[in-house]
C-alpha cells in the first residue's frame, strides 16, 4: 500500500514521471528495510539474553504506533516524516520477528524443530498472502465511497463529455489505482487517445500531466488509507496482547539429555 501511495500520488506530485515512479518508490522505501536490518539482529541478541516476551511485545507496540503515525500523515507529506515512520515500521517488525521465531523454536523439543520451522514459515507466508487480499479489499472499499464522483467532476471540468466522464468514473477503482502502479498515466489510459484528441489542447495537457490524477485521488485515497492503517494498527495491538501472554522461554533438552536424566532417576519436570 505504501508503494501505491508513492507511485500513484506522491512521486507524480513531486515532479517524477510515471515511468520513473517504480524505481523511485523502491528507493524511498529503503528506510523500512534499514530499520528491519538493524533491529532484527539486535533484538535477537537481546532476546537470547533477556527473553523474547518483552522485546517482541515492544516490537508490536512500535509497529502499531507507526501505523497510527501514517494515518495522521497528509497524503502529500514531507518525505522525512514518512521516512521516519516507515523506518519505525521496519524497526518494530524486526523487534518482533527475531525474538518471536526464537521463542517458537525454543518451545519444542530438538527433534521437532524442523517441523516447527516449517509450520512457522507456512503460517507466515499464508498470513502474508491473506493480508494482501484484505488490505486491497479495504482500500478499494475506501476508494469506492468518493472516487467516482471526484473523478467525474474533475473530468467534466476539463471538457470531457459528461457521458464519457461518468463512464470512466463508473469503472472499478482498482483500474485507476493499478494503472499508476504500472508506470502509466491513469487518465491517458482510461480516456484513450480517441477521446483525448477531441479535447482542447489545454485540457489534454492538464489531463495527461503529472499532477491532475494525483490531485484528484488525494482525498479518496486518504479515506482508504485511514481504513487500512486503522485495521493494521488494531491487529498489531492484538498481536502485542498475544505476545504478552506467551509463556516464559524454555529451551527443551535434547533427547540424549532427557534419556540421561531418566536413567539417573531425575524426573523430567
Task: Describe each PLM feature range.
Residues 29, 39, 97, 107, ...:
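Selective for proline/serine-rich intrinsically disordered segments
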Residues 1-101, 105-111, 115, 131:
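Transmembrane core module of solute transporters
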Residues 15, 24, 125-242, 253, ...:
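Hydrophobic transmembrane architecture of multi-pass small-molecule transporters
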Residues 119-123:
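Hydrophobic alpha-helical segments of secondary membrane carriers
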Residues 5, 61, 80-81, 154-155, ...:
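Short, intrinsically disordered/low-complexity patches at protein termini
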Residues 42, 69-73, 138-139, 239-249:
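Residue-level signal for alpha-helical transmembrane segments in multi-pass membrane proteins
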Residues 115, 256-257:
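Intrinsically disordered terminal tails
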Residues 12, 45, 49, 75-79, ...:
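Transmembrane helix-loop junctions in multipass membrane proteins, especially transporters and channels
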